[in-house]
Amino acid sequence: MADTLLKCTTRHVRLFTARVDNQDLVPSADELTLDLDPDNEFLWSDAVVSKVQQRFQQLVEAGAGGELSDYSLRRIGTDLEGYIRQLLQAGELSYNPDGRVQNFSMGLPRTPDLL
């Protein structure tokens, strides 16, 4: 698999079986790279990024020893996407008002006026 790059792409999460080397993805059989919110739809605090990275690490550790496949990457990506939605609904994450597109892909913002 050293020459094969597996990837999973969801709306806000991209996973690659690769490492970043001089801004390039280099396929790697024993490393996963997480690209979080590539379209900058959300405003991320360091604490929230850390929570998502910790969840990512938990998912990777839970799958350790298993087959690394498109399916296993999709499961991790889908779980992270759901976790991001939970953070948004809990008010820990917010939409970026300066984002390229305002499509509210995970539902309308939760503000006191709308609750």
From Swiss-Prot:
Q: Name the top EC class.
A: translocase
Subcellular localization is given as: Cellular thylakoid membrane
Question: Which reaction is this enzyme known to catalyze?
Answer: a plastoquinone + NADH + (n+1) H(+)(in) = a plastoquinol + NAD(+) + n H(+)(out); a plastoquinone + NADPH + (n+1) H(+)(in) = a plastoquinol + NADP(+) + n H(+)(out)
Q: How does it sit in the membrane?
A: Peripheral membrane protein
Main localization of the protein described in the UniProt heading? membrane
Q: Which is one Pfam family of this protein?
A: NdhM
Q: What are the GO MF terms of this UniProt record?
A: oxidoreductase activity, acting on NAD(P)H, quinone or similar compound as acceptor; quinone binding
A Gene Ontology cellular-component term: plasma membrane-derived thylakoid membrane
Question: Superkingdom of this entry's organism?
Answer: Bacteria
Give the keywords, sorted.
Membrane, NAD, NADP, Plastoquinone, Quinone, Thylakoid, Translocase, Transport
| Assembly, per entry | NDH-1 can be composed of about 15 different subunits; different subcomplexes with different compositions have been identified which probably have different functions.
Q: What does this protein do?
A: NDH-1 shuttles electrons from an unknown electron donor, via FMN and iron-sulfur (Fe-S) centers, to quinones in the respiratory and/or the photosynthetic chain. The immediate electron acceptor for the enzyme in this species is believed to be plastoquinone. Couples the redox reaction to proton translocation, and thus conserves the redox energy in a proton gradient. Cyanobacterial NDH-1 also plays a role in inorganic carbon-concentration.
Family of this protein: Belongs to the complex I NdhM subunit family.
Protein name as it appears in the record: NAD(P)H-quinone oxidoreductase subunit M
**Taxonomic classification:** Bacteria, Bacillati, Cyanobacteriota, Cyanophyceae, Synechococcales
